Swiss-Prot record:
GO BP terms, alphabetized: translation
One of the record's GO cellular component terms: cytoplasm
Encoding gene, per UniProt annotation: rpmJ
Matches recorded under PANTHER family: 50S RIBOSOMAL PROTEIN L36, CHLOROPLASTIC, LARGE RIBOSOMAL SUBUNIT PROTEIN BL36C
InterPro entries per UniProt: Ribosomal_bL36 (IPR000473), Ribosomal_bL36_sp (IPR035977)
Family of this protein: Belongs to the bacterial ribosomal protein bL36 family.
Keywords: Ribonucleoprotein, Ribosomal protein
Protein name as catalogued: Large ribosomal subunit protein bL36
Statement: the UniProt record of this protein carries the keyword Ribonucleoprotein: yes
């Protein structure tokens, strides 16, 4: 899980999810794409 100031979808499998006021990118196809805004 990378922590970034700006998160972007990196492939078509990436999903944008909001949890506890934070924006997360979750990707089941390529877990390297997982990101959270911090």
């Amino acid at each position: 899980m990378k922590v970034r100031s700006s998160v972007k979808k990196r492939c078509e499998h990436c999903q944008v999810i909001k949890r506890h006021g934070r924006v997360l990118i979750i990707c089941k196809a390529n877990p390297k794409h997982n990101q959270k805004q911090g």
